[in-house]
Amino acid sequence: VYVDRGVKIGNGVKIENHATVYAGVQIEDKAFVGPHVTFTNDLHPRSFSTDWKIVETLVKEGASIGAGSVVMCGVTVGEYAMVGAGSIVTKDVPPRALVYGNPARVRGFVCKCGRKLKKEKENQKFVLMACLHCSEKYPISKESYTKYRKSKGEQ
């Protein structure tokens, strides 16, 4: 594991073997960083550049980042979100979103226990999602849910 100077790591965080966490990354409490995960910190990397700036990245509480993923600088991975193995994260990940792929896209939503959520009902602002495993329920913003449906080709 390589953790650069200035990285902020919360309580109960698990960072697996061969992860690389560069300056500018903040990982909040109870997050998980899988093996071979890499965080970047420079939008315009050049070996000869003298004016580069660290671009901050935030991994929120309870989020999980799967093995071999790359998290580009400047993004926020939301609370209890889950990034699938081998993903390339180029944009913010909403809270409780399940994302994977290259680039990573929202493919669903997950419970705090890690299982996929099912849509229960919706109103103008939120979609209520429920976990069939532990019976927890979560309001997901209509904006996040709409992006998910569009990524599936739905209207």
Question: Whereabouts are the PLM-identified features?
Answer:
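Short, intrinsically disordered terminal segments enriched in charged and Pro/Gly residues
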Residues: Y145-Q155
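Short linker/helix segments within small regulatory modules
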Residues: E120-L128
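Alpha-helical "lid/cap" subdomains adjacent to substrate-binding clefts that gate access
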Residues: A130-C131, Y138-I140
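Short, non-ligating residues that shape and space the ligands of small metal-coordination modules
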Residues: K119-E120, P139-E143
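Structural signal for interior beta-strand "rungs" in well-ordered beta-sheet cores
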Residues: V1-Y100, A104-V106
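Cys/His-rich metal-chelating microdomains
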Residues: G114-K116, K137
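Cys/His-enriched microdomains
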Residues: V106-F109, M129
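Short cysteine-rich clusters marking metal-coordination/redox-active sites
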Residues: C111, C131-C134
